[in-house]
Amino acid sequence: MSITLSDSAAARVNAFLANRGKGFGLRLGVRTSGCSGMAYVLEFVDEPAAEDTVFEDKGVKVVIDGKSLQFLDGTQLDFVKEGLNEGFKFTNPNVKDECGCGESFNV
């Protein structure tokens, strides 16, 4: 099982953590949402819980809860700029279907 980050995603997460002034790493998870069933959740974490799994890639610790891990295994997190917009992009090999707006997915 693994979660990987592109160079641009790692740089962006490290910049956010530096601006925040503290933090263990980035929590990546899923929640029920949208028309396709699930949506990604990103937040900073100061201390992982006992049931969390921690991955490290390019110096960034990525924390995933046990319920989300099965849906996120193999995911690559990227940070992209498209025109005037920028944000994190997920490449998840488990996704079977996405909603038209791109906000939610199903595995």
Curated annotation (Swiss-Prot):
It comes from the Bacteria. GO terms for molecular function: 2 iron, 2 sulfur cluster binding; iron ion binding. Fe cation binds at C35, C99, C101. It holds the Pfam family Fe-S_biosyn. One of its GO terms (cellular component) is cytosol. GO terms for biological process: iron-sulfur cluster assembly. The keyword rRNA processing does not apply. Keywords: Iron, Metal-binding. Its cofactor is Fe cation. Belongs to the HesB/IscA family. Homodimer; may form tetramers and higher multimers. This is Iron-binding protein IscA. It comes from Klebsiella pneumoniae subsp. pneumoniae (strain ATCC 700721 / MGH 78578).
